[in-house]
A protein has these predicted regions:
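Short, small-residue-biased leader/transition segments that mark boundaries at the very start
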Residues: 3-20
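A generic local structural motif
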Residues: 4-7, 80-82, 124-128
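Generic structural signal for beta-strand residues in well-ordered domains
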Residues: 11, 85-87, 131, 202
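Rhodanese-like catalytic fold shared by cysteine-dependent sulfurtransferases
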Residues: 16-74, 99-138, 146-266
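Internal catalytic-core helix/loop-beta-alpha segment
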Residues: 68, 73-92
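Structural scaffold elements adjacent to functional motifs in cytosolic proteins
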Residues: 95-96
Length: 266
């Protein structure tokens, strides 16, 4: 179980057997103000979370803009069934609001990559590039919809009139769109042990580098600079030998825990 709570929104992820999951959702929806809470489901063969984790944050996803308040106004929602048709219009610009390492493994055809390594850099990117999009309708998307709630509020506050975003994010689109009809290319990065999911929302082909957190393809993991649990070709020069030694010790403890049939929680 993983829970993040801020004044703007609460985000919860539950990994459980289906019968328990249904009971959890029923319980949450019975709480005051939670009857219409939005849920998404995907299947996995193993537990995606090692432990229960609850965090109180100023922002669920840090944007660093003091006047952002998605509870007051957001862009207009586009349902997954209408997304592809809408985004193919000549007067629509499609922007992926996620980080570049997420976009590298999958995105919508023809979408713009802001090439940012954190969400708080999105406002700066917009300020530098907004003149290119003058007079256009702006359609944005992200993994589950939270970053779009905030980025659409930001653009509306900047005076942009026609702001839209994908309802429920990429995961909702993949759930409700047949692959043969889809405008999605690649896999979708997710923030749990699955690392990525494919179009069927099953665990994808990517694994995560423990050191830098970047998603690694099979080719990346076959690189001579890749050391499992320690570093990859993308980050091998980013960490000192002391830190790499600590990563190796951690990996050793993980393997020992696995031999004992236990999960390593560190």
């Amino acid at each position: 179980f993983k829970q993040k709570t801020a004044y703007e929104i609460s985000l919860g992820l539950v990994g459980s057997e289906m019968c328990i999951r249904d009971r959890v959702i029923t319980y949450i929806k019975a709480l005051p103000g939670c009857a219409k809470i939005e849920t998404k489901t995907s299947l996995n063969l193993s537990q995606p979370f090692n432990r229960m984790k609850v965090r109180l944050k100023k922002e669920i996803v840090t944007m660093g803009q003091p006047n952002i308040d998605p509870s007051k106004k957001v862009g207009r929602y586009i349902d997954p069934k209408n997304w592809d048709e809408f985004t193919k219009k000549d007067d629509v610009v499609v922007i992926d609001t996620r980080n570049k390492y997420e976009i590298e493994i999958g995105t919508f055809k023809g979408s713009i990559n802001p090439d940012t390594d954190s969400f708080k850099k999105f406002p700066g990117w917009w300020e530098k590039n907004k003149d290119k999009f003058h007079g256009k309708k702006i359609a944005m998307f992200c993994t589950g919809g939270i970053r779009c709630e905030k980025s659409s509020n930001y653009l509306l506050n900047q005076g942009v009139k026609d702001v839209f975003h994908l309802k429920g994010g990429i995961l909702n689109y993949l759930e409700k769109t047949k692959k043969v009809d889809s405008n999605w290319e690649g896999e979708c990065y997710v923030f749990d042990h699955r690392v990525s999911v494919n179009h069927d929302l099953n665990k994808g082909s990517y694994e995560c580098c423990f050191a830098c957190g970047r998603p690694l393809s099979l080719t990346d993991r076959s690189d001579s600079k890749f050391e499992f649990g320690v570093s990859c070709a993308k980050c091998i020069d980013e960490f000192s030998e002391d830190r790499k030694a600590r990563f190796r010790e951690r990996q050793k403890q993980i393997l020992l825990a696995e031999k004992r049939g236990k999960d390593h929680l560190g």
